[in-house]
A protein has these predicted regions:
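Nucleotide/phosphate-binding catalytic cleft detector across ATP-hydrolyzing
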Residues: 1-36, 44-163, 171-199
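Active-site or pore-adjacent capping/gating segments
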Residues: 168
Length: 199
């Protein structure tokens, strides 16, 4: 049973659970997740281990991509240059680890900037990485999924607050009607899994 959100709760609308659930990851494969936010660029490369993941490599850099965005409505030349430099390091790590399954996303700064889509094209040209500018709803969805391992059998309601550099997402989910043994897994079904990409 899919987790439910009370009507009128004021949280972001979360789509119903996708069915069937994503195919379980292969233990020999590496997976990567990259989050390009308003202030920082972060990436994790991990390998499935048991019911979780073992981190193989990681990267985090303050790029201040959203610096000056409030005044100009655009990403500045300096912030884009800093970000490109950080993403080149990420690309090298992905290639060195031979990662083929990944999800690379950009959030609020690129959503709001008039030149956000243009910057995504530049990133692909200069680094070979294809980033998706995701909507606030999907950003909130991913935040909820990341909390799934913290959900235990006694959890009835879940409030997730994702505070970023340029936006804050809140999601309230009622999982009281989901069988206790399935509660964490039902949250994982909120998303369609990972993407395969070239580096």
């Amino acid at each position: 049973m899919a987790p439910q959100r009370p009507k009128g709760a004021g949280a972001l609308d979360v789509p119903p659970a996708l069915s069937p659930a994503p195919v379980p990851p292969r233990s020999t494969e590496l997976y990567a997740a990259l989050d390009l936010g308003t202030n920082s660029c972060r990436m994790l490369i991990a390998q499935p281990k048991g019911s979780g993941f073992h981190v193989v490599d990681s990267f985090s850099k303050s790029v201040q991509l959203g610096a000056g965005l409030e005044k100009t409505g655009r990403l500045s030349r300096g912030s884009m240059t800093r970000t490109i430099q950080a993403l080149r390091i990420c690309q090298q790590k992905l290639r060195r680890n031979k990662v083929r399954r990944m999800r690379l996303v950009a959030t609020e700064a690129c959503r709001r900037a008039a030149n956000g889509a243009e910057f995504m094209q530049r990133i692909q040209r200069e680094t070979g990485l294809k980033l998706d500018i995701i909507k606030p709803e999907e950003e909130a969805q991913l935040a909820v999924i990341s909390c799934a391992p913290l959900v235990n059998r006694k959890t009835h309601n879940l409030l997730v607050v994702d505070i970023g550099g340029g936006s804050t997402e809140l999601v309230w989910i009622d999982i009281s009607k989901v069988p206790k043994a399935d509660r964490a897994q039902s949250i994982m079904r909120l998303h369609g899994g990972v993407h395969q990409a070239k580096t």
